[in-house]
């Protein structure tokens, strides 16, 4: 999701960047981007996880529920019952 956000942001910057009189597109874009923004910083922000995500994972991993497993989808994890167990059978076939 963060990657899509950055791609969309950079596309908007390229489209809406004001060009100075006789200037190049890069000079207009450089005026909109902070000086400390480097490719390394951008990649680090895309790869690293937020502190709240790490804390949430720690609490989820330490509190298991009976007959449930940890179901993770796109960095959001919840405890859910096993999908192949039907509740109406009560353990009988």
From Swiss-Prot:
Disulfide bonds: 72-77
Subcellular location: Secreted
Protein name: Consomatin G2
N-terminal signal peptide: 1-18
D-tryptophan, modified sites: 74
Gene source species: Conus geographus (Geography cone)
Prodomain positions: 19-69, 79-93
Entry's family note: Belongs to the conotoxin C superfamily. Consomatin family.
Keyword field: D-amino acid, Disulfide bond, G-protein coupled receptor impairing toxin, Secreted, Signal, Toxin
Entry text on domains: The cysteine framework is C-C.
Keyword Disulfide bond annotated: yes
Signal in keyword set: yes
Tissue: Expressed by the venom duct.
Function according to Swiss-Prot or TrEMBL: Moderately activates human somatostatin receptors (SSTR) with a preferential activation of SSTR1 and SSTR4. In vivo, does not cause behavioral changes in mice within a few minutes of intracranial injection, but causes a progressive loss of movement thereafter. Four to five hours after injection, mice recover, even with the highest dose tested. Shows antinociception and antihyperalgesia activities in two mouse models of acute pain, most probably by acting outside the central nervous system.
Misc note: This peptide is an evolutionarily optimized stable analog of somatostatin. In addition, it adopts nearly identical conformations as in the somatostatin drug analog Octreotide. As this drug, it contains a D-Trp at the same position, whose synthesis is a common strategy used for enhancing the metabolic stability of compounds in drug design. Consomatins evolved by gene duplication of a 'Somatostatin and related peptides (SSRP)' gene expressed in the snail neuroendocrine system.
């Amino acid at each position: 999701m963060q990657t899509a956000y950055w791609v969309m942001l950079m596309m908007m910057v390229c489209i809406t960047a004001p060009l100075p009189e006789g200037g190049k597109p890069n000079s207009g874009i450089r005026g909109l981007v902070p000086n400390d923004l480097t490719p390394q910083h951008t990649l680090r922000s895309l790869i690293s996880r937020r502190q709240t995500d790490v804390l949430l994972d720690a609490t989820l991993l330490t509190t298991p529920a009976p007959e449930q497993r940890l179901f993770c989808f796109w960095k959001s994890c919840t405890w859910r019952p096993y999908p192949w167990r039907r509740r109406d059978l009560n353990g009988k076939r």
